[in-house]
């Protein structure tokens, strides 16, 4: 979940003096459309071969936390099968003059490794315990919002997303819930 700070609640005429509207300022920055996935693939499901599982072992990953603050550390675990270097591009989603996102950071040619599929546990829970592929501190100037990590396998150009939230713990007018875990 993320709180969006700096917006106006219904019935408010203007922002408090000198508060600035960091979301509006961020959204006015130039964006780009390269955040979209253009080459995806899914594999048949384990129960029914006619239904895609929603995952592609070519490149897939998850984050150590789904919600972080600026200054926090974030680990991203990635598996590539077959083993392949991969690129990670991190985008903040938003209006950005209609482009939908802004590129915040790129990691080129990260070494890939095939990480084991977890066993099915009690209640059909699968708990990945993969090794981190990259770890970084969230920059202090990254404002609250939904962030996409676009993963691209070098060997096949297949792509997928990891999703995380940068949150701001100040009081806010709007709460947005993002359910990215399955």
Where are these regions (language model features)?
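Residue-identity detector for glutamine
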Residues: 12, 33, 115, 129, ...
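Ligand-binding face of N-terminal immunoglobulin V-set domains in extracellular IgSF glycoproteins
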Residues: 59-164
């Amino acid at each position: 979940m993320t709180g969006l700070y700096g917006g106006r609640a219904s019935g408010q005429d203007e922002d408090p003096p000198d508060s600035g509207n960091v979301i509006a300022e961020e959204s006015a920055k130039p964006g780009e459309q390269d955040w979209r996935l253009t080459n995806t693939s899914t594999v048949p499901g384990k129960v029914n071969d006619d239904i895609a599982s929603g995952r592609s072992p070519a490149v897939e990953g998850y984050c150590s936390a789904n919600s972080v603050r600026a200054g926090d550390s974030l680990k991203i675990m990635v598996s590539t099968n077959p083993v392949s270097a991969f690129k990670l591009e991190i985008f903040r989603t938003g209006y950005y003059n209609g482009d939908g996102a802004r590129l915040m950071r790129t990691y080129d040619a990260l070494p890939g490794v095939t990480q084991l599929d977890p066993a099915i546990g009690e209640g059909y829970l699968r708990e990945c315990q993969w090794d981190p592929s990259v770890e970084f501190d969230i920059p202090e100037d990254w404002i609250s919002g939904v962030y996409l990590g676009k993963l691209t396998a070098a060997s096949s150009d297949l792509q997928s997303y990891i999703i995380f939230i940068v949150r701001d713990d100040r009081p806010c007018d709007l709460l947005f819930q993002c359910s990215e875990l399955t």
